[in-house]
Amino acid sequence: MNHARIAELLQPFLGISGNAVISSELCPSEPAEAGKKPALLSPLQLQLISTYIDILVRWNARINLTSIRDPEEIVTRHFGESLFAACHLFPSGSSVPRLSQASVSSVPCSGVKDFARPRVADLGSGAGLPGLPIKLWAPHIALTLIESNQKKATFLREVTRTLILTDVNVYPDRAETLATPSGFDLVTLRAVERFAEVVSIAARLVAPAGRLALLIGTSQLHQAQTILPDFSWQEPLAVPISHSRILLVGHRYC
């Protein structure tokens, strides 16, 4: 797929509102020259996303990874939503986040975690979304893709191998069998069947003071907040170019 077209389709999702400075390969900190649009994606990242899409389209003809067949819709519906979450979860991108005093005090726990290599789990990863796009945005994370469907797990290994991604582990079993003594710093989950059951499983994987990020429909907002009272929820963020999708992030209390 044409790299310029991918960048154009993804731009609405990477445009962080306000005057925040994004220090990342994806969102450079240098201001754009007058009359020029910022280069939101590096050539390497565009190539990786393009290759990822090619693999996804090819495998999707054999196994059901997504009901979406149009490559451009795959970019907006899947990669756009995933990178929107990535920009908000890791606003420093490839840099190790530096917490301000205000952000430290907002964490509902007395201890501050080491953010040098956050442990991230993507539950029910399927086609690798949002986990792998988050990894492309924040390559310093250690990512675990949890997918019990063996064919989909094989696909995830193929993408990881082809893109030469490090610190990515594919766990081909149910999350309930995953041994996580200290939990994950971040767990991601997109809208799934049996939402109430699965979101409870996701919450149990989150370490104290860790985060749970849900890409869900607005109809599931109240349900998530009610089921998980042990989390301090941020205001939900509307996903661009969507009438009903939101990003909901909660911090787990110690």
Language-model-derived ranges and their functions:
Residues 1-22, 36-93, 99, 115, ...:
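Class I SAM-dependent transferase core
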Residues 82, 132-133:
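Hydrophobic alpha-helical segments in the ANL/AMP-binding
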Residues 115-124:
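Conserved class I S-adenosyl-L-methionine
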Residues 127:
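Conserved SAM/SAH-binding loop
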Residues 131, 137-254:
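S-adenosylmethionine
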